[in-house]
From Swiss-Prot:
GO molecular-function terms, A-Z: magnesium ion binding; phosphoglucosamine mutase activity; phosphomannomutase activity
Gene that produces this protein: glmM
Name of the protein in question: Phosphoglucosamine mutase
Domain of life from the UniProt record: Bacteria
Function: Catalyzes the conversion of glucosamine-6-phosphate to glucosamine-1-phosphate.
This protein's GO CC annotations: cytosol
SUPFAM superfamilies: Phosphoglucomutase, C-terminal domain (SSF55957), Phosphoglucomutase, first 3 domains (SSF53738)
Reaction catalysed by this enzyme: alpha-D-glucosamine 1-phosphate = D-glucosamine 6-phosphate
Amino acid sequence: MTRKYFGTDGVRGTVGEFPITPDFVLKLGWAAGKVLGARGGSKILIGKDTRISGYMFESALEAGISAAGVDVRLLGPLPTPGIAYLTRTLSAQAGIVISASHNPYTDNGIKFFGADGRKLNDEIELEIERLLDEQMSVVSTDQIGKVRRIDDARGRYIEFCKSTAPGLDLNGMKIVVDTANGAAYHIAPDVFEELGATVVPLANQPDGFNINRDCGSTHPEALQRKVVEEKADLGVALDGDADRLLMVDHAGNLVDGDQLLFVVARDRKENGAEMDGVVGTLMSNFGLELALQAEGIEFVRAKVGDRYVMEQLDKRGWNIGGESSGHLVCLDCTTTGDGTVSALQVLAALSRRKQGLAESVADVSMLPQKMINVRGPNRDGFMENGDVQAAMADVEDRLAGNGRILLRPSGTEPLVRVMIEGKDVDRVESLCRELAEVVEKAIN
């Protein structure tokens, strides 16, 4: 069955434009309540990030779910992985996240976790979609779901984060923490501080509009400057819903998801944890693959998206995977990507090696990689375009086996990502621009 509303990461779009409207979200809550309630669900959790529209959609979901006869527990602003954690520890049937992740405040989205703290399976999402086309009804008055807030959600999640790095002592470390004015603004700084670090908070004053604006993992420049200015040991950058992590070393150099994945995987292997292999994506730098190979760790590429990384991890029985963008998954700690937990795993690895971040990533050399996001409405079938095919063949000939090309439509935005990787940075950038120009003509 073709999906009508759910994309690769729930329902997402511009606030006020269908389907990100209060009336649709009301009905989505009702449909979810009907489907999950019929499966024996007693309650559904709702959490959100800090964008202004979150309050509106929280109310809509709350009304829809309770109209279907299912109880609701409101978590307030909380990182996406925190909602996943509480869904399973509070024995909820599902957790709903109101967030558009790293997108600006003008966007929002709705995604679901199942009772196990993992993304809701396709079968249930399709059941919910089917009900969205039916007439909404309300249960009898005595069966309407009850709603209450979970006042200690923040504290529960902070304690969980700390528990994933037992014995970690950050005394003597100075860490700049950029929470992107997002869901971790009142959580991540406290986690590191409670473990002994001196914390310099950055972008931790959300006003409903400034989420991800010139801050966080998508705009780490301010963090890079602040780390140098404060003479900090390192910096941590999260995104708006705190499931992504990038870091900055003491000199202000950005450390991406591929490099962090290497640090965590090597640490697991060196310290006797089960480490058969690592799952990356089609976008993962070839340098990561080479570095893991040198450590005797197998590397497999999944399609882009944490959903597909998780599928490969489950299929192979592995624990560690991630994306260049900073989605790191440590299934030996939690059930989904978690920026704060991932940062603690990196810090624990540095502590065990008695190294700084720059020294620890020196063993993974990233090949020059250029990516251009090409916007356009006509993404379907662009790979069959003759001009695009000819341009790709030409670029592959000129790379002469010393690089790779990837063209990939975004799952959440109207754009195509054009990526080229190779040994010579100037050549890579030139070829990427050439190919992007051809793609732009094809999709516009």
